[in-house]
Amino acid sequence: MRKLSRRLRELYAKVEDRPYAPLEALQLLKETATAKFPESAEAHIRLGIDPKYTDQQLRTTVALPKGTGQTIRVAVIARGEKVTEASAAGADVVGSEELIDEIQKGRMDFDLLIATPDMMPQVAKVGRILGPRGLMPSPKAGTVTFDLPQAIQEFKAGKVEFRADRSGIVHVLFGKASFSAEDLLVNLKALQESIDRNRPSGAKGRYWRSVYVAATMGPSIQVDINALRELKLAEAA
């Protein structure tokens, strides 16, 4: 077993093995973000789903009201006037078939890929490259659309795509550890509501199993699920 550094031992000692009230958990997250670089705030949520069944898969988006604290590079694959439209709307990388060819050759200088529906048959050719990186455009994620200005604006403003992995766990960055605990709570609440709103039709039994938050290099902190779900928006704002 790897030996923990003194810094990590001290951080782990601050966290009790119990569910914390949401705001208390986020205050503790900030307190344990002591790395020498700007840490992100992460949520790790275990759901009662088995994604090997199509009716128990979760892939959707959430608009984080307080943003992500990150600058993301958006790429768009379109044709004709939609290329000009995407550039004018602030896309960082724009192209048609030639961009697909560049991706096939290894180009990956973007964090998010949006495509117009008419380009999806061509985009499918690089699905094996994009899929494992979580970059394959999807209607569910809002990344297959003709309304490019709105999609670009939303993702740059803090809209985040997420999915449950094969174990039914959702991993999401929901802000920076430098955000106030109150702002992190607003974002975490928005994430919880999106997960509830998009509950897979085949999910049976207890949907929410556990919620943990952590700074990038910090210990995991358990959040009281019921307290988070019962929290009113006015309290979180």
UniProtKB/Swiss-Prot annotation:
Keywords assigned by UniProt, alphabetized: Repressor, Ribonucleoprotein, Ribosomal protein, RNA-binding, rRNA-binding, Translation regulation, tRNA-binding
Q: Which PROSITE patterns match?
A: RIBOSOMAL_L1
Instruction: Tell me the Pfam families matching this sequence.
Output: Ribosomal_L1
Q: Please give the biological process terms from Gene Ontology that the record holds.
A: regulation of translation; translation
Repressor: present as a keyword of the record? yes
* Quaternary organization: Part of the 50S ribosomal subunit.
Q: Which family does it belong to?
A: Belongs to the universal ribosomal protein uL1 family.
Name-wise, this protein is: Large ribosomal subunit protein uL1
Q: What is the species of this protein?
A: Thermosynechococcus vestitus (strain NIES-2133 / IAM M-273 / BP-1)
Taxonomic lineage of the native organism: Bacteria, Bacillati, Cyanobacteriota, Cyanophyceae, Acaryochloridales
